[in-house]
Amino acid sequence: MTRCFRLLHGLLAATAVLLAAHVVVILFTGGYAVRGLGVRIGGHRVLAPVIVLIAVALARRFVRYRAGASVRFFAPPAAATVFLTCLLVYLANGQTIWSGDTLPARYLPLSILREGNFDLDEFPFLQDPRKFPNQWFIRYANGHVVSDYPVGAALLALPFYVPSALGTVAAETRLVEELEKLAAATIVALSAAVLYLTLRRLTTASAALLVTAAYALGTTSLSESSQALWQHGASQLGLAAALYCLVRGRQQPHWTAFAGLPLAFAIISRPSDLLIALPLGLYVLIHRPRQVAGFLLAGLPVGAFQLWYNATTFGNPFRVQFFFSMTTAIHDLPSGAGVWTTPVWDGLRGVLLSPARGLLVYSPFVLFSALGMLLVWRRGGDRLLRYAAPGVVAIVLLYSRWVNWWGGSSYGPRLLADLSPVLALFIYPVVPILARSRALRMAFIALVAWSVGAHAIGAFVDDRSWNWNGNMVVDRFPERLWSWSDNQLVNPPRDAFHRAVIAARRLPTSRNAPQLLSASYRSDSPASVVIDCGQTLQLSVGATNVGRAAWLAQSARERGLVRLGWRWYRDGRSLPLAEGRVLLGAAVLPGESHEFRASITPPREPGAYVLEVGLLDEWVMWFAERGTPPIRLAVTVGSAPVLPERADALPAMIHELRVAADHVPRLAVSTDRSRYRPGDVLRVALDGSAAGRSWTVDAYLMLWGPGGRRWFYDGRHIVRARECQWTPLARAVALPDGHRRRVVLDLPTAELPVGSYTWHLLLTEVDGYRIVAAAETSFELTSAKTAVNGWQGGSVEAELNHRDRDLPGQPRVARRADLGQR
């Protein structure tokens, strides 16, 4: 038997070496050809061989364990087994998830390794408005395109990109997506291994293994953090490592000082972790005073890096990205204004109990974490966890107050992912109770099983669990977050059940029998609609399957999927516009009905159109071709609101719109000088303030030039406007009562002809086109060769810091209120 094990071990070792060599070559080249065979190996795919390599490594470890080697499979030294097992599970779906939030972290390692900087200038596709109409994930600073998110995750991903950065791999290949996935999965798997080591110092091996499994597979660690380079993975690893150091520091005091490094890294990766770091730092100060200096010194390099990054990127060492700048708005914004306006009980109910985002719905085993949190406060309870508990509560309350508490388009309670290792550690005080009570033990195991299943749906069930966010964009229709019949947990199991029924009854389907498809529609929409250019049409359509074939919600290569679609017609001709789609959540059997909700954007050119809405069998036919008449609506698209040419026309317009004049936002547009030469950088300042009430508005900017020609700013250039008159400047802007906000833009003038120009700005109510304020300013573009005095370029961000002034006697207002995905 020993000889057989040795032979098997040798074969596995040889296989591992070959696979490792194969992976390294792919990472350097993006794929390679085998001479003589005429085939290409790899082809920008690296996940599959890595998955096999990990499986082989686990098999070798198991063979050594069975052969009686001195390696215990799930003993404390076997944290490597925990790491490899988690990594294998995270990669097993073989998929990459697209999210704009993670795009900077995907490409930053290439920029750091190839160019030695932190900008994204060399990736112009990230700035392409055709690919990314809303570029919330980047910003422009000091003349460069930079990430709008902390760079901690990108720094941890650097080792995975080294071969590709040194090799010939292009940025726009699938291999780079897979490198992001591999890095994210490895980071979270490491956090699971570190958590296991921490728990082994506190409880038994079996309890440590069960709690680690709950953390690794029953939280967003499986469904999100391990699938792409969000900030959460780096945050989880940093917090897990800090807790390990602090726990080990009880027996070996110098380990307490080491906690400063991972804790500081967690903060720069996810600045909200400061709410946990502060009480943990207080624990060190009070109970480990001799380690305070070492604790601070350990975190000093990370803090110094962040200050350097802020200074070189934004021109100010204390100018930070995204979330930390948003948290400063908590004390800046008065009640009822800005991004921290959700009533705390409403937000708390959402982050804990929402069918689409609730922590207790997707990871209900954390109820035992809450019990552990109570137990540590009794006499003799764990002193370290007493300090961690307020940080957990603070972060939950923080996100409960955010207006976007559901975290945009995501799966489950993504915003609370950072708390996962801390919540897992709070279970260990409950272990003695679980050991004594079989009922509680079974309840805990059942809740862990539910949690694993819930997050496995997000990780393994194709894209359908994610597509739920986009059918009716959840950011615009947050009421969908409270549906118990249509959510990311219910739809995939329902679809699986219906597919089982289809197989058992041998029903024809939309894929193999499209000739049997038929439907009846119902809609409460009027026969004719008038809508302004740029607005969206909300449509609810009920569809009943009156045919003999089942409608499929998933199918290989999408062929045979039944979806709701629409087409636009003008003068009897179909327009070359992208046909919209709304997806089914689950298969629909004959006799069943499904309610579709669609958000439809009309053509941008004003005029009369016909909108045709109906079901289609993807890649096969529209139902209308089989005799099911579609819903037809006559849609009149009007012009976007037109700004009055004269400023004195504004009060009359406001009066007609029934907006109280004394509550109208004050608005001004100004340029840094009145005359420019072609090629100069034009600086436009937009100043808004509110008095009497708070506003949340959309801003629209338009440049009128010589001969009445109109231009607009697309985020990078001033370009000629061909269709819609007004274009949005920002997704949403908050104007709190009594506050003033300034936005400064640097605009190139190279594309503009010589002549006189007028900038027009208007503010409208969010999700509507009712104008509430308007302003204008003029400038001259001259070809004169004489010098034109004035500002000639620089950093928008730095200028914001110096010029974001407030009304006299009023508190400072936050500079951003972007309500996009975070």
What kind of feature is each model-predicted range?
Residues 167-174, 192-218, 237, 250-258:
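Transmembrane-helix signature of polytopic, membrane-embedded enzymes
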Residues 109, 211-213, 242-245, 255-270, ...:
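Membrane-interface alpha helices of multi-pass inner-membrane proteins
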Residues 194, 234-263, 422-426:
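Specific aromatic-rich, kink-prone transmembrane helix
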Residues 73-83, 296-304, 384-393, 431-460:
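Signature aromatic-anchored transmembrane alpha helix within multi-pass, membrane-resident enzymes
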Residues 275-308, 370-381:
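Perimembrane helix-loop-helix junctions
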Residues 2-3, 281-285, 361-383, 389, ...:
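Hydrophobic, aromatic-rich transmembrane alpha-helices
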Residues 1-18, 48-91, 200, 294-297, ...:
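Start-transfer (signal-anchor) and selected internal transmembrane alpha helices
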Residues 179-203, 241-244:
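Transmembrane-helix motifs of polytopic, lipid-linked glycan transferases
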